[in-house]
């Protein structure tokens, strides 16, 4: 069966004409401040792709508010509108983080009186010591390396308007930062970004997907993602060259050809397998798929029909 049978395929040109918005445009400096390493994004992308998406999210938020109001009428009591939770998934190096930060900024502009928080699921990885003790350090990034029960608990608490402390993951140290956390306290909108956002833990009464009001999958051809991953790996090495505390510093002492081979080996052994077996199969669970081509250019959008 065609995976996209339940989606409308919309060209970028058609999509950009679906809605004209009055949201103040971003400056180039603002856009640069949220751009991830080696990601490509322009003000034209914001205007063509992301502002119509913001309008669509506005409709989903209104629908959530209307449903809460209707439930209150039925139950004859006040029902507080829960936060709108947006999930963003996709492969390593595909540009999820940039999309998440951009949406946070644009939603903050669209709803200036509301709180818009952003959390990455990296914070729910087990610590390096825990992974070693569990004997799965070489499986870091795969589903079993995440504390999915804690992630589910986090989403449950947020939906119920309760405070939650989220661990903070450092890409510099390649581990959870000890004694540091991000406090999420009753946001109006929450964006959750990570490779496992649309994955469901087994043997759970509650699925992660139950908590999302809207979900996005950032998609691209596997060969392109590999290219972007290798480029990012190279950029990370350059940043780590003079920082001995950086996880990637250890690789800066290696000959260039060996570093390239190492990056390719990590891609083939970890990231490609993870993409094929665990990430891409969740793609059709998303409400919308942003499809990228060369230079991270979004050429088409898939919107779920029902």
Swiss-Prot record:
Keywords: ATP-binding, Coenzyme A biosynthesis, Cytoplasm, Kinase, Nucleotide-binding, Transferase. The keyword Cell membrane does not apply. GO terms for molecular function: ATP binding; pantothenate kinase activity. ATP binds at residues 90-97. Gene3D superfamilies: P-loop containing nucleotide triphosphate hydrolases. Its EC number is 2.7.1.33. This is Pantothenate kinase. It comes from Lactococcus lactis subsp. lactis (strain IL1403). The gene is coaA.
